[in-house]
Amino acid sequence: MVAETPEITVRDNVEAQVYDALIGDQVVGSIVYERSGQRLVFSHTIVEPEFRSRGIGTVLVTKALDDIRARGMTLTNYCEFVADFIAAHPGYADLIDAEHPGHPRRRRAKGVEGAEGA
């Protein structure tokens, strides 16, 4: 039997400078960022432990990157989870700011789950 994943809503909480993933009214994940002109700077992604391994991080990153593209903005990335996502989905690589890319993709140590947990 396959468990259904509840519908995930992603919103940009501009005042708090986070993209939030919600199931109903509950925030289950976030991408923390700062805005610098027409560029967002991602610092880290968090998914609450009890909601990990359900694809929430993937939905959150996808919708946040789609929003950046729709706004005509660029991204400086310091989050390894987002770096791994972009490496696996190179169609988003053009969003990385050429002058301020952040850090290059780094692999996590084998067997070590990052704090992000997707």
Where are these regions (language model features)?
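Terminal substrate-recognition subdomain of acyl/acetyltransferases
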Residues: V2-S30, D66-T76, E80-A118
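Residue-level recognition of conserved beta-strand positions in structured domain cores
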Residues: I23, R35, H44-T45, N77
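Conserved donor-binding loop and adjoining core beta-sheet/short helix segment
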Residues: I31-L40
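Generic alpha-helix structural propensity
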Residues: F42, I56-V59, N77
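A short, internal acetyl-CoA/4′-phosphopantetheine-binding micro-motif in the GNAT/acyltransferase core
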Residues: T45-R52
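Conserved acetyl-CoA-binding loop-helix of GNAT-fold acetyltransferases
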Residues: S53-D66
